[in-house]
Curated annotation (Swiss-Prot):
The gene is lolA. The lineage of its organism: Bacteria, Pseudomonadati, Pseudomonadota, Gammaproteobacteria, Alteromonadales. This is Outer-membrane lipoprotein carrier protein. Monomer. Belongs to the LolA family. Participates in the translocation of lipoproteins from the inner membrane to the outer membrane. Only forms a complex with a lipoprotein if the residue after the N-terminal Cys is not an aspartate (The Asp acts as a targeting signal to indicate that the lipoprotein should stay in the inner membrane). GO terms for biological process: lipoprotein localization to outer membrane; lipoprotein transport. Its main location: periplasm. It comes from Shewanella pealeana (strain ATCC 700345 / ANG-SQ1).
Length: 208
C-alpha cells in the first residue's frame, strides 16, 4: 500500500513548470505560473476500481520553483519525499531506508513527473483538456503507470489533485491551509540523511 502513496506523491510536484502549448495546455500554464511557492496540508483517499476506500492518509505538501518538492505523509505511516532541485530522496522511517535518484530517474519512475520540466518535446507526449476549474492530463503512451491526472483550482489556488493508475486505483488529494513558502520553510527542501539508515543510491546504479 505504501507503494501506491509513493507513486502518487512522485507524481504530485510536478505541475510547476508546464510549457506553453496549444489549447488546454496554455490555460493550465497560466494557472500554474501564478503559483510560485506553496505549502499546504493534504488529505488523501485511495479507492480501488470498485470505488472501495483502501487507504487514507494526511500530511504536509510544499512546492517551490524550480524543481523543489516536499511531501511528508504523517499518517497512517510516516514517509517523506524531498526533491531538492537536483535529486529526489525517498525516506521510509519504519524500514530505516533511504532511496535517492536524480530528477530524470524520477521522471522515468513516474511519467507524470515530467510536469516538473518545461521541455516542449516531453510535453508533446501528453494531452491536456480544460474542464472549467479542472484540467485532465493524460499520457499518450498507454503503457504509462499513471493513466490520468486531474488538477483543480479555486481561482488562483490549487485545491485538488486526482491521480488514476492503470490498475484502477484513484488517489484523491485535497489541499487546505495554503500559504506561500516562508523564509523559515525553505529548509524543507534540504534532505539530511539520518544516521544508521540503509541508502539505495540509484544515481550510482544508473551510471554503471
Amino acid at each position: 500500500m505504501k507503494k501506491i502513496f509513493t507513486i502518487a506523491a512522485l507524481s504530485l510536484p510536478l505541475f510547476c513548470h508546464l510549457p506553453a502549448m496549444a489549447g488546454g495546455q496554455d490555460d493550465l500554464k497560466v494557472k500554474l505560473m501564478e503559483i510560485n511557492t506553496l505549502k499546504a496540508n493534504f488529505n488523501q483517499t485511495v479507492t480501488d476500481i470498485n470505488q472501495k476506500v483502501i487507504q487514507t492518509g494526511e500530511g504536509v505538501f510544499a512546492l517551490s520553483h524550480p524543481n523543489q518538492f516536499y511531501w511528508h505523509l504523517t499518517a497512517p505511516d510516516e514517509s517523506l519525499i524531498v526533491a531538492d532541485g537536483t535529486d529526489v530522496w525517498i525516506y521510509n522511517p519504519f524500514a530505516e531506508e533511504v532511496s535517492v535518484m536524480d530528477i530524470n530517474q524520477a521522471i522515468n519512475a513516474s511519467p507524470i513527473a515530467l510536469l516538473v520540466h518545461s521541455d516542449d518535446a516531453t510535453w508533446s507526449q501528453y494531452d491536456v483538456v480544460n474542464n472549467g476549474d479542472c484540467f485532465d492530463i493524460s499520457p499518450r503512451d498507454k503503457d504509462s503507470g499513471v493513466s490520468e491526472v486531474e488538477v483543480c483550482f479555486n481561482q488562483q489556488q490549487l485545491t485538488k489533485m486526482v491521480l488514476k493508475d492503470q490498475q484502477g486505483n484513484t488517489s484523491d488529494f485535497t489541499l487546505t491551509n495554503q500559504t506561500p513558502i516562508a523564509e523559515n520553510d525553505k529548509d524543507l527542501f534540504k534532505f539530511i540523511v539520518p544516521d544508521d539508515v540503509d541508502i539505495d543510491d540509484q544515481r550510482l546504479k544508473s551510471q554503471n
